[in-house]
């Protein structure tokens, strides 16, 4: 079978089709069960993080090394020639000449797409501002499939910051290809953007808006939590909003035994630590799955057959 991701840039989740996503999930599942240390043998990946990152950068570097590849790069754009005024286009041209693929995070929206236009090797977006974070979506899809055994027809709630959270935008767009039903739970000021809702309506995807988690809890297969960003509100308003969207043990009353809680992390106060010990909590395993999803994507982008 032809590998459709071979030598492909992955900048946005919309760059991938449903079969592409299913291929990444299946490959991640296989690599988690049967590690293969040869898939990136003799491959050199450039890890270019112009913006600080913990989980994304370390999981990519772990993924490369566990597949037998080598990695070069930087974790702080302030220590590169960008500080001297070098353009991103020039930087990527040079970095691409040293490597087989570039993994990049950048604070500016659209930076990854720009980089792909000047790179002779595949560029994988590790996050560009509040725009896109496709590999987070892929690890979310893998985690959902791992816990539910499928992606089709699930009931998924998104809670918290639905306006600025790039993870919820991308995941909603991806899951819309699998005919899932969505429940949006957020402060009015942080509601899901109109363009996402309009896109879902055009596709015939069912979604509804709610004020509390409790009113939909019994229906859910996946509860996707996000943090309300403190910096976007004054102290009084933040405390009011944040307190309204905290997941506690009592909130979980009536949940399906198979329901799982996901969170892109970092967690602040929106999930009580007591929830960590319940069988519903899956956010730490979700973060671990980032290694396998990124292994799968790198292997597919850099190998004609996997």
UniProtKB/Swiss-Prot annotation:
NCBIfam families: asp_carb_tr, PRK00856.1. Carbamoyl phosphate binds at residues 55-56, 105, 133, 136, 265-266. HAMAP family: Asp_carb_tr. It comes from Aeromonas salmonicida (strain A449). Heterododecamer (2C3:3R2) of six catalytic PyrB chains organized as two trimers (C3), and six regulatory PyrI chains organized as three dimers (R2). InterPro entries: Asp/Orn_carbamoyltranf_P-bd, Asp/Orn_carbamoylTrfase, Asp/Orn_carbamoylTrfase_sf, Asp_carbamoyltransf, Asp_carbamoyltransf_Asp/Orn-bd. One of its GO terms (molecular function) is amino acid binding. Pathway: Pyrimidine metabolism; UMP biosynthesis via de novo pathway; (S)-dihydroorotate from bicarbonate: step 2/3. GO terms for biological process: 'de novo' pyrimidine nucleobase biosynthetic process; 'de novo' UMP biosynthetic process; amino acid metabolic process. Belongs to the aspartate/ornithine carbamoyltransferase superfamily. ATCase family. Keywords: Pyrimidine biosynthesis, Transferase. Catalyzes the condensation of carbamoyl phosphate and aspartate to form carbamoyl aspartate and inorganic phosphate, the committed step in the de novo pyrimidine nucleotide biosynthesis pathway. PANTHER family: ASPARTATE CARBAMOYLTRANSFERASE (PTHR45753:SF6), ORNITHINE CARBAMOYLTRANSFERASE, MITOCHONDRIAL (PTHR45753). GO terms for cellular component: cytosol. This is Aspartate carbamoyltransferase catalytic subunit. L-aspartate binds at residues 84, 166, 227. Pfam families: OTCace, OTCace_N. The lineage of its organism: Bacteria, Pseudomonadati, Pseudomonadota, Gammaproteobacteria, Aeromonadales. The keyword rRNA-binding does not apply. It catalyses: carbamoyl phosphate + L-aspartate = N-carbamoyl-L-aspartate + phosphate + H(+). Its EC number is 2.1.3.2.
């Amino acid at each position: 079978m032809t590998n459709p991701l071979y030598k492909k840039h992955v900048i946005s989740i919309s760059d991938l089709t449903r079969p592409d996503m299913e291929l990444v999930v299946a490959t991640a599942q296989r690599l988690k069960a049967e590690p293969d240390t040869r898939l990136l043998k003799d491959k050199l990946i450039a890890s270019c993080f112009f913006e600080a990152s913990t989980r994304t950068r370390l999981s990519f570097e772990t993924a490369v090394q566990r597949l037998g590849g080598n990695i070069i790069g930087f974790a702080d754009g302030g220590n590169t020639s960008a500080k001297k005024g070098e353009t991103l286009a020039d930087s990527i041209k040079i970095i691409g000449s040293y490597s087989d693929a570039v993994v990049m995070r950048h604070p500016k929206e659209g930076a990854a797409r720009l980089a792909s236009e000047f790179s002779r090797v595949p560029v994988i977006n590790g996050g560009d501002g509040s725009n896109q974070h496709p590999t987070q979506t892929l690890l979310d899809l893998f985690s959902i499939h791992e816990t539910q055994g499928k992606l089709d027809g699930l009931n998924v709630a998104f809670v918290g910051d639905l306006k600025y959270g790039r993870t919820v935008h991308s995941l909603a767009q991806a899951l819309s290809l699998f005919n899932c039903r969505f429940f949006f739970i957020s402060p009015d000021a942080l509601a899901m953007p109109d363009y996402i809702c309009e896109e879902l309506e055009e596709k015939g995807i069912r979604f509804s808006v709610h004020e509390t988690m409790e009113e939909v809890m019994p229906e859910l297969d996946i509860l996707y939590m996000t943090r309300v960003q403190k910096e976007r509100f004054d102290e009084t308003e933040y405390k009011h909003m944040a307190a309204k969207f905290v997941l506690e043990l009592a909130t979980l009353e009536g949940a399906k035994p198979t329901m799982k809680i996901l969170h892109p992390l970092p967690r602040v106060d929106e999930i009580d630590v007591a929830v960590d010990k319940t069988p519903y909590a899956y956010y730490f395993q979700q973060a671990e799955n980032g290694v396998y999803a990124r292994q799968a994507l790198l292997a597919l982008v850099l190998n004609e057959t996997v």
